[in-house]
Regions:
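Cytochrome P450
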Residues: 1-402
Length: 402
């Protein structure tokens, strides 16, 4: 989920009504993971209220479909948790969404050879990827693919990305409406992803489809209409990645993600589930952040004409504008952890074994850390001062690409 908030000017009547509605709710009823809050814009007021009144907030089972969890909404608390993997473990968890059930696991991964006990064990382990591992496994998995987005490799890719961006922009229609997200944001991102995975360019939109399905719940109007369609797509991605990795092991090493996983000295010990998990992280991370940042930059510059004029007058602000866009729209709303012991944070004790959501999107609006945090200002003194890429050992691997 991503979030777009209005400029921090006087509130409209509709915004005032929405804010009053959120502030009238019992504090315990607030559930930042409620997807309905995001398209409506209500999430702005949910986080504003939580930062002010209950920055370490507990959502009970009766108020969420995801099961009970804690929310950290202030910058300092998020940073404290994100940099303390001893107390806040990433093992087997990425978001506050309920783990996949054994039935859902079987629908995707069981080729007829898995026993019921193996399916149960896989479901109990939860997610296995470089995002959902603690040391030492985390370092091993991150090291296997990090070279693909190293500064040196990205420098080699830069001319190609620039050439493609120019060609896409030159092909846009003049004097008529068009879908910027589809024709520019998705297209350039899909082309780049296909290069990073060494996947056929003519099939690049398949990568976009898989990413969309992997990051959304099934339902009418969603990337997958139902659970069966979602399971089929995830199974298709799993099979494709497995076949690509096995094929690359017999080929000369290259710098794409799949080849790096195939030839890493550590990857011979990776399970198929771990290769799939790492591939999912790389696919979704490379798709969401880049695509949404391209789209958000156009949206924000259009809605903030004074910032647009500032950028036109001084193109040297482009790097700062990109960082501010990433902060303001926060492509990844949150990451989750599980406490390994009772942990006191900001005066509250979170019991051992509880799930904790670090809401980056709220921390990026924390007025105690960022002046005029709800405004879009492309020439901030420290534009990279944001939470969008996380902190600590799990800081976004592809932040330089974004």
């Amino acid at each position: 989920m991503t979030i777009a908030l209005s400029r921090d000017t006087e509130l409209t009547a509709e915004q005032t009504e929405a804010r009053d509605r959120i502030y009238a709710l019992p504090l315990a009823a607030l559930n930042p993971a409620n997807p309905a809050h995001y398209p409506s814009g209500d999430i702005r007021w949910v986080f504003e209220r939580l930062r002010a009144e209950d920055p370490v907030h507990f959502t009970s089972d009766e108020n969420t479909e995801h099961g009970p969890y804690w929310s950290l909404t202030r910058w300092a608390d998020i940073q404290a948790a994100d940099t303390n993997h001893d107390a806040f473990s990433a093992e087997g968890i990425i978001t506050v969404a309920r783990p996949r059930t054994p039935e859902q696991i079987a629908a995707v991964f069981n080729d007829g050879t898995m026993t019921p006990e193996e399916i149960e064990a896989r479901a109990a382990r939860g997610s296995r990827s470089l995002l959902s591992m603690d040391p030492p496994d985390h370092e091993i998995h991150r090291g296997a693919v990090s070279e693909g987005v190293s500064p040196a490799n990205l420098a080699m890719l830069e001319p190609l990305i620039r050439e493609r961006a120019g060609a896409i922009l030159d092909s846009l229609p003049i004097g008529e409406e068009f879908d910027w997200v589809d024709k520019v944001s998705i297209e350039l991102t899909a082309m780049t992803l296909a290069t990073l995975f060494d996947y056929p360019q003519e099939k690049r939109r398949q990568l976009t489809r898989w990413s969309n399905i992997l990051t959304s719940l099934p339902g009418p109007g969603m990337a997958a209409e139902n659970e069966e369609e979602r399971a089929a797509a995830v199974r298709e991605f799993f099979t494709t990645i497995s076949e690509m990795v096995n094929r690359r092991r017999d080929e000369e090493p290259r710098m794409d993600f799949v080849s790096l996983m195939a030839h890493s000295p550590h990857s011979k010990d990776f399970t198929e589930a771990e290769i799939f998990g790492d591939s999912t992280v790389l696919l979704v991370g490379g798709n969401d952040t880049t695509r949404n940042t391209i789209s958000a930059s156009v949206y924000l510059l259009h809605n903030n004409p004074e910032q647009n004029e500032k950028l036109r007058a001084n193109p040297a602000l482009i790097p700062s504008m990109v960082s501010e866009t990433i902060r303001w729209q926060t492509p990844l709303t949150h990451m989750a952890r599980r406490t390994t012991r009772d942990v006191e944070i900001n005066g509250k004790v979170i019991p051992k074994g509880d799930r904790v959501a670090m809401w980056y999107v709220s921390g990026n609006r924390d007025e105690t850390k960022i002046e005029n945090a709800t405004e879009y200002i492309i020439d901030r003194k420290n534009p990279r001062h944001h939470l969008s890429f996380g902190f600590g050992i799990h800081r976004c691997l592809g932040n330089k690409l974004a």
